[in-house]
Swiss-Prot record:
This is Toxin coregulated pilus biosynthesis protein F. It is found in: Cell outer membrane. Its main location: membrane. Residues 1-20 form the signal peptide. It is a peripheral membrane protein. It comes from Vibrio cholerae serotype O1 (strain ATCC 39315 / El Tor Inaba N16961).
Length: 338
Protein backbone atom coordinates (compact mmCIF):
# COMPACT_ATOMS: atom_id res chain seq x y z
CA UNK A 1 0.00 0.00 0.00
CA UNK A 2 1.37 3.45 -1.02
CA UNK A 3 1.10 6.21 1.50
CA UNK A 4 1.86 9.91 1.68
CA UNK A 5 5.12 11.56 2.67
CA UNK A 6 3.57 12.21 6.06
CA UNK A 7 1.38 9.34 7.13
CA UNK A 8 -1.18 10.01 9.83
CA UNK A 9 -1.43 6.67 11.52
CA UNK A 10 -2.97 5.98 14.88
CA UNK A 11 -1.75 2.50 15.66
CA UNK A 12 -4.17 0.27 17.46
CA UNK A 13 -2.54 -1.79 20.15
CA UNK A 14 -3.44 -5.44 19.71
CA UNK A 15 -1.91 -8.64 20.91
CA UNK A 16 1.82 -9.17 20.51
CA UNK A 17 1.41 -12.32 18.47
CA UNK A 18 -0.71 -10.67 15.79
CA UNK A 19 2.23 -8.90 14.18
CA UNK A 20 5.36 -10.26 12.57
CA UNK A 21 8.36 -8.69 10.94
CA UNK A 22 8.79 -8.99 7.19
CA UNK A 23 10.97 -11.70 5.65
CA UNK A 24 14.08 -9.51 5.65
CA UNK A 25 13.78 -8.85 9.38
CA UNK A 26 15.89 -11.49 11.02
CA UNK A 27 14.49 -12.85 14.25
CA UNK A 28 17.57 -15.04 14.56
CA UNK A 29 20.05 -12.28 13.93
CA UNK A 30 22.63 -11.65 16.62
CA UNK A 31 23.04 -8.31 18.26
CA UNK A 32 25.43 -5.38 18.43
CA UNK A 33 29.18 -4.91 18.55
CA UNK A 34 31.23 -4.51 21.68
CA UNK A 35 33.87 -1.83 21.51
CA UNK A 36 36.31 -4.07 23.35
CA UNK A 37 35.84 -6.86 20.80
CA UNK A 38 35.60 -4.66 17.73
CA UNK A 39 38.11 -1.83 18.06
CA UNK A 40 38.65 -2.19 14.33
CA UNK A 41 35.12 -3.08 13.40
CA UNK A 42 35.95 -3.59 9.73
CA UNK A 43 38.17 -6.54 10.52
CA UNK A 44 36.25 -8.07 13.35
CA UNK A 45 33.66 -10.80 13.28
CA UNK A 46 32.42 -9.85 16.74
CA UNK A 47 30.10 -7.18 15.44
CA UNK A 48 27.45 -6.73 18.06
CA UNK A 49 26.69 -6.06 21.68
CA UNK A 50 25.90 -9.21 23.67
CA UNK A 51 22.85 -9.63 25.82
CA UNK A 52 24.72 -8.30 28.83
CA UNK A 53 24.66 -4.85 27.23
CA UNK A 54 20.89 -5.11 26.76
CA UNK A 55 20.55 -5.81 30.47
CA UNK A 56 22.73 -2.78 31.26
CA UNK A 57 20.38 -0.44 29.39
CA UNK A 58 17.30 -1.81 31.12
CA UNK A 59 16.15 -4.80 29.09
CA UNK A 60 14.14 -7.21 31.21
CA UNK A 61 15.69 -10.67 31.42
CA UNK A 62 12.25 -12.10 30.66
CA UNK A 63 12.25 -10.51 27.20
CA UNK A 64 15.87 -10.79 26.12
CA UNK A 65 14.73 -12.46 22.90
CA UNK A 66 13.73 -8.96 21.75
CA UNK A 67 17.37 -7.96 22.05
CA UNK A 68 17.95 -9.74 18.75
CA UNK A 69 15.34 -7.62 17.03
CA UNK A 70 16.31 -4.01 17.86
CA UNK A 71 19.68 -2.31 17.82
CA UNK A 72 20.98 -0.11 20.59
CA UNK A 73 18.74 2.93 21.20
CA UNK A 74 20.16 5.87 19.27
CA UNK A 75 20.04 7.96 22.45
CA UNK A 76 22.66 5.74 24.10
CA UNK A 77 26.33 6.74 24.16
CA UNK A 78 27.30 3.16 23.36
CA UNK A 79 25.54 3.47 20.00
CA UNK A 80 27.98 6.21 19.00
CA UNK A 81 30.98 4.67 20.73
CA UNK A 82 30.75 1.79 18.25
CA UNK A 83 31.89 4.06 15.41
CA UNK A 84 35.64 4.45 14.86
CA UNK A 85 37.03 7.96 15.09
CA UNK A 86 37.54 9.41 11.60
CA UNK A 87 39.48 12.58 12.45
CA UNK A 88 43.24 12.79 12.84
CA UNK A 89 42.83 14.54 16.17
CA UNK A 90 40.69 11.68 17.44
CA UNK A 91 37.50 13.74 17.59
CA UNK A 92 34.23 11.91 17.20
CA UNK A 93 32.26 13.07 14.16
CA UNK A 94 29.24 10.88 14.83
CA UNK A 95 27.46 12.14 17.93
CA UNK A 96 23.98 12.27 19.41
CA UNK A 97 23.83 15.98 18.61
CA UNK A 98 24.78 15.49 14.96
CA UNK A 99 22.38 12.56 14.61
CA UNK A 100 19.51 14.61 16.05
CA UNK A 101 20.29 17.64 13.89
CA UNK A 102 20.20 15.60 10.67
CA UNK A 103 17.00 13.86 11.73
CA UNK A 104 15.18 17.10 12.62
CA UNK A 105 16.39 18.78 9.42
CA UNK A 106 14.98 15.97 7.31
CA UNK A 107 18.44 15.08 6.02
CA UNK A 108 17.58 11.40 5.95
CA UNK A 109 19.96 10.38 3.17
CA UNK A 110 23.02 11.57 5.08
CA UNK A 111 21.64 10.02 8.26
CA UNK A 112 21.34 6.72 6.43
CA UNK A 113 24.84 7.00 4.98
CA UNK A 114 26.69 8.07 8.12
CA UNK A 115 24.86 6.24 10.89
CA UNK A 116 23.16 3.22 9.39
CA UNK A 117 24.92 2.01 6.24
CA UNK A 118 28.22 2.64 8.01
CA UNK A 119 27.16 1.17 11.33
CA UNK A 120 30.13 -0.93 12.46
CA UNK A 121 31.41 -0.83 8.87
CA UNK A 122 29.81 -4.13 7.95
CA UNK A 123 30.41 -5.17 4.36
CA UNK A 124 26.98 -6.78 4.38
CA UNK A 125 24.61 -4.10 5.60
CA UNK A 126 22.56 -5.48 8.44
CA UNK A 127 20.82 -2.40 9.83
CA UNK A 128 17.99 -0.29 8.51
CA UNK A 129 15.45 2.36 9.42
CA UNK A 130 12.30 0.49 10.51
CA UNK A 131 9.38 -0.03 8.15
CA UNK A 132 5.85 1.01 9.13
CA UNK A 133 5.00 -2.57 10.09
CA UNK A 134 8.10 -2.78 12.24
CA UNK A 135 7.18 0.45 14.02
CA UNK A 136 3.77 -1.05 14.73
CA UNK A 137 5.39 -4.13 16.21
CA UNK A 138 7.79 -2.04 18.29
CA UNK A 139 4.84 -0.07 19.66
CA UNK A 140 3.26 -3.34 20.73
CA UNK A 141 6.52 -4.45 22.35
CA UNK A 142 6.79 -1.13 24.19
CA UNK A 143 3.25 -1.21 25.50
CA UNK A 144 3.92 -4.67 26.92
CA UNK A 145 7.24 -3.55 28.44
CA UNK A 146 9.26 -5.90 26.25
CA UNK A 147 11.96 -3.47 25.10
CA UNK A 148 14.63 -1.66 27.07
CA UNK A 149 13.63 0.94 29.63
CA UNK A 150 14.47 3.76 27.21
CA UNK A 151 12.66 2.27 24.22
CA UNK A 152 9.54 1.34 26.18
CA UNK A 153 9.05 5.08 26.78
CA UNK A 154 10.07 6.19 23.29
CA UNK A 155 7.60 4.10 21.34
CA UNK A 156 4.42 4.91 23.29
CA UNK A 157 3.68 8.04 21.22
CA UNK A 158 5.44 10.15 18.64
CA UNK A 159 6.22 10.75 14.98
CA UNK A 160 8.64 8.12 13.70
CA UNK A 161 10.84 8.02 10.64
CA UNK A 162 10.25 4.90 8.54
CA UNK A 163 11.75 3.61 5.31
CA UNK A 164 10.33 1.14 2.85
CA UNK A 165 11.37 0.36 -0.73
CA UNK A 166 13.85 3.24 -0.62
CA UNK A 167 11.18 5.76 0.41
CA UNK A 168 11.15 7.73 3.67
CA UNK A 169 7.83 8.36 5.42
CA UNK A 170 6.67 9.60 8.80
CA UNK A 171 4.33 7.52 10.96
CA UNK A 172 2.26 9.22 13.66
CA UNK A 173 1.52 7.16 16.76
CA UNK A 174 -0.95 8.23 19.44
CA UNK A 175 -2.50 11.23 17.69
CA UNK A 176 0.44 13.60 18.22
CA UNK A 177 0.43 17.02 16.46
CA UNK A 178 2.10 17.37 13.06
CA UNK A 179 4.71 19.72 14.48
CA UNK A 180 5.98 17.09 16.93
CA UNK A 181 9.69 16.43 16.24
CA UNK A 182 10.43 13.27 14.25
CA UNK A 183 12.05 10.39 16.16
CA UNK A 184 14.23 7.42 15.20
CA UNK A 185 14.67 5.67 18.58
CA UNK A 186 16.50 2.65 17.12
CA UNK A 187 17.64 1.12 13.90
CA UNK A 188 16.65 -2.48 13.31
CA UNK A 189 18.33 -5.65 12.09
CA UNK A 190 17.17 -6.66 8.63
CA UNK A 191 19.16 -9.84 7.96
CA UNK A 192 21.69 -12.24 9.44
CA UNK A 193 25.22 -11.24 10.37
CA UNK A 194 27.99 -11.77 7.85
CA UNK A 195 30.48 -14.46 8.68
CA UNK A 196 30.36 -16.15 12.03
CA UNK A 197 27.52 -15.55 14.44
CA UNK A 198 29.44 -14.50 17.52
CA UNK A 199 26.50 -13.89 19.81
CA UNK A 200 23.48 -16.16 19.97
CA UNK A 201 20.39 -16.70 22.05
CA UNK A 202 22.08 -17.34 25.38
CA UNK A 203 22.10 -15.22 28.50
CA UNK A 204 25.66 -14.35 29.59
CA UNK A 205 26.72 -15.92 32.89
CA UNK A 206 23.31 -17.58 33.16
CA UNK A 207 23.41 -20.26 30.48
CA UNK A 208 20.57 -22.48 31.56
CA UNK A 209 21.76 -23.14 35.11
CA UNK A 210 19.11 -25.74 35.95
CA UNK A 211 20.68 -28.66 34.08
CA UNK A 212 21.82 -31.54 36.28
CA UNK A 213 24.31 -34.06 34.90
CA UNK A 214 24.03 -37.55 36.33
CA UNK A 215 27.68 -38.46 36.65
CA UNK A 216 29.36 -41.74 37.56
CA UNK A 217 28.35 -44.82 35.59
CA UNK A 218 25.47 -43.04 33.84
CA UNK A 219 27.52 -40.30 32.18
CA UNK A 220 30.98 -40.30 30.60
CA UNK A 221 33.31 -37.61 29.28
CA UNK A 222 36.74 -39.18 28.83
CA UNK A 223 39.21 -39.82 26.00
CA UNK A 224 38.89 -42.90 23.84
CA UNK A 225 35.13 -43.35 23.76
CA UNK A 226 31.79 -41.73 23.21
CA UNK A 227 30.54 -38.89 25.33
CA UNK A 228 27.44 -39.97 27.26
CA UNK A 229 25.44 -37.47 29.28
CA UNK A 230 22.26 -38.06 31.23
CA UNK A 231 20.78 -34.59 31.63
CA UNK A 232 17.96 -33.50 33.91
CA UNK A 233 16.00 -30.38 32.91
CA UNK A 234 13.39 -28.49 34.89
CA UNK A 235 10.08 -28.76 33.00
CA UNK A 236 8.97 -25.27 34.05
CA UNK A 237 12.20 -23.81 32.68
CA UNK A 238 11.71 -25.63 29.39
CA UNK A 239 8.15 -24.36 29.14
CA UNK A 240 9.26 -20.80 29.88
CA UNK A 241 11.50 -20.93 26.82
CA UNK A 242 8.82 -22.33 24.55
CA UNK A 243 9.46 -26.06 24.93
CA UNK A 244 5.99 -27.48 25.45
CA UNK A 245 6.45 -30.69 23.44
CA UNK A 246 9.30 -32.25 25.40
CA UNK A 247 9.62 -35.13 22.93
CA UNK A 248 10.23 -32.89 19.94
CA UNK A 249 13.82 -31.89 20.68
CA UNK A 250 17.31 -32.44 19.37
CA UNK A 251 20.77 -31.85 20.77
CA UNK A 252 24.04 -30.63 19.34
CA UNK A 253 27.32 -31.58 20.95
CA UNK A 254 29.81 -28.75 20.44
CA UNK A 255 33.57 -28.81 20.91
CA UNK A 256 35.70 -25.68 21.04
CA UNK A 257 36.78 -22.75 23.17
CA UNK A 258 33.97 -21.03 25.12
CA UNK A 259 33.55 -17.28 24.87
CA UNK A 260 35.15 -15.55 27.85
CA UNK A 261 32.00 -13.57 28.77
CA UNK A 262 29.11 -15.83 27.87
CA UNK A 263 30.65 -19.28 28.16
CA UNK A 264 29.13 -20.24 24.79
CA UNK A 265 31.14 -22.07 22.11
CA UNK A 266 30.24 -19.85 19.17
CA UNK A 267 32.70 -21.27 16.64
CA UNK A 268 32.94 -25.01 17.34
CA UNK A 269 35.77 -26.99 15.79
CA UNK A 270 33.46 -30.00 15.91
CA UNK A 271 29.72 -30.42 16.24
CA UNK A 272 27.42 -33.40 16.09
CA UNK A 273 23.63 -33.42 16.01
CA UNK A 274 22.04 -36.21 18.01
CA UNK A 275 18.54 -37.39 18.86
CA UNK A 276 18.31 -38.18 22.57
CA UNK A 277 17.11 -41.33 24.24
CA UNK A 278 14.29 -40.36 26.58
CA UNK A 279 13.92 -42.63 29.61
CA UNK A 280 10.51 -42.90 31.21
CA UNK A 281 11.65 -42.71 34.84
CA UNK A 282 11.41 -38.93 35.13
CA UNK A 283 10.98 -37.24 38.47
CA UNK A 284 7.99 -34.96 38.99
CA UNK A 285 8.63 -31.64 37.27
CA UNK A 286 11.84 -32.93 35.67
CA UNK A 287 12.71 -34.24 32.22
CA UNK A 288 15.61 -36.62 31.54
CA UNK A 289 17.49 -36.84 28.25
CA UNK A 290 20.27 -39.31 27.47
CA UNK A 291 22.64 -37.76 24.93
CA UNK A 292 25.62 -39.56 23.39
CA UNK A 293 28.02 -39.04 20.50
CA UNK A 294 28.46 -41.61 17.75
CA UNK A 295 32.19 -42.18 18.21
CA UNK A 296 32.22 -45.92 17.67
CA UNK A 297 30.71 -45.49 14.21
CA UNK A 298 32.52 -42.37 13.02
CA UNK A 299 36.11 -43.02 14.03
CA UNK A 300 35.98 -41.37 17.45
CA UNK A 301 35.70 -37.90 15.93
CA UNK A 302 34.32 -36.31 19.08
CA UNK A 303 36.95 -37.86 21.34
CA UNK A 304 39.86 -37.16 18.99
CA UNK A 305 38.83 -33.53 18.60
CA UNK A 306 37.91 -32.85 22.20
CA UNK A 307 41.20 -34.09 23.62
CA UNK A 308 43.47 -32.68 20.91
CA UNK A 309 43.72 -29.33 22.68
CA UNK A 310 43.72 -28.64 26.41
CA UNK A 311 41.62 -25.50 25.85
CA UNK A 312 38.76 -27.36 24.20
CA UNK A 313 35.55 -28.08 26.07
CA UNK A 314 32.31 -29.84 25.25
CA UNK A 315 28.96 -28.09 25.39
CA UNK A 316 25.47 -29.48 24.82
CA UNK A 317 22.89 -27.38 22.99
CA UNK A 318 19.17 -28.12 23.14
CA UNK A 319 16.78 -26.94 20.40
CA UNK A 320 13.47 -28.06 19.00
CA UNK A 321 13.45 -31.07 16.70
CA UNK A 322 13.82 -28.95 13.56
CA UNK A 323 16.61 -26.84 15.03
CA UNK A 324 14.39 -23.87 15.84
CA UNK A 325 13.52 -22.37 19.20
CA UNK A 326 15.49 -20.59 21.89
CA UNK A 327 18.96 -22.12 22.09
CA UNK A 328 19.52 -23.60 25.53
CA UNK A 329 23.14 -24.27 26.38
CA UNK A 330 24.68 -26.42 29.05
CA UNK A 331 27.83 -25.43 30.83
CA UNK A 332 30.96 -26.05 28.76
CA UNK A 333 32.60 -29.15 30.26
CA UNK A 334 36.15 -30.40 30.40
CA UNK A 335 37.06 -34.03 31.17
CA UNK A 336 34.71 -35.80 33.61
CA UNK A 337 32.16 -32.96 33.34
CA UNK A 338 34.34 -30.54 35.26
Amino acid sequence: MRYKKTLMLSIMITSFNSFAFNDNYSSTSTVYATSNEATDSRGSEHLRYPYLECIKIGMSRDYLENCVKVSFPTSQDMFYDAYPSTESDGAKTRTKEDFSARLLAGDYDSLQKLYIDFYLAQTTFDWEIPTRDQIETLVNYANEGKLSTALNQEYITGRFLTKENGRYDIVNVGGVPDNTPVKLPAIVSKRGLMGTTSVVNAIPNEIYPHIKVYEGTLSRLKPGGAMIAVLEYDVNELSKHGYTNLWDVQFKVLVGVPHAETGVIYDPVYEETVKPYQPSNNLTGKKLYNVSTNDMHNGYKWSNTMFSNSNYKTQILLTKGDGSGVKLYSKAYSENFK
